[in-house]
Amino acid sequence: MRVIPVACTVLALALLSPSTQAAPQAQAATDAATPESKASDAVARIRQLAVEIERETAPRDVERRKFNELKSLIDAEAIAQFVLGERLSGAPAAQRTAVISALSDLIADGLMERLGGAHAEPFELEGARRIDNGDIVVVSHVRFRDGHRGELDWRLHAKGANQLMVDVLVDGASVAVGARDQAATELSSNGGSIPRLTASMRNRLRFK
């Protein structure tokens, strides 16, 4: 006589739709997503896209789509503000847009070169931590072209619901600081021209 309740329970579970069963799991996954996990996922995605673009043969439009996705994980506007400061704020809108786009392309191109080649194995994520200003630092290691195991410390901050890259330290050297120093040198020699700086950035790109 005890078989009937058990059978009813089994039948009730079987009648649950896949979406009904999946909903609590999806909600749990959403609830479990922390800034640290989002930042780690963003870095992992940058690495994956770099590998796919550098190592796979694909139509140009596919490569461009992946390149644009990689750029979407970089807060180029924030980096450009750090790099150029008041020069960016005082530039005409068209010049601001152009230089931010060029800087975004240049940083993404550098990440592809650093992380995408066959030399860049293994790539290891070592963990994430929040720093005092609320940004997240993600530590990773990868083999560089010269054969040594280098450290990349990624700094990401919240923008909307996402965590976007605002800097990466390569063996302790900041990409953002390097870009700022390079820009300062070029601006001092080109009369302070943002368009000339933009053209110079584009001339240094591998992926065009």
Task: Outline where the language-model segments fall.
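N-terminal signal peptide c-region/cleavage motif recognized by signal peptidases
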Residues: 17-19, 23
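Positively charged n-region of N-terminal signal peptides that target proteins for export
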Residues: 1-4
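Bacterial N-terminal signal peptides
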Residues: 7-16
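Solvent-exposed loop/turn segments at secondary-structure junctions
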Residues: 88, 105-106, 130-131, 144, ...
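Early exported N-terminus immediately downstream of N-terminal targeting peptides
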Residues: 24-111
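Short beta-strand edge/turn micro-motifs at domain boundaries
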Residues: 149-178
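Low-complexity, intrinsically disordered terminal/linker segments enriched in charged
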Residues: 170-208
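Surface-exposed, charged secondary-structure patches
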Residues: 101, 109-150, 200, 204-208
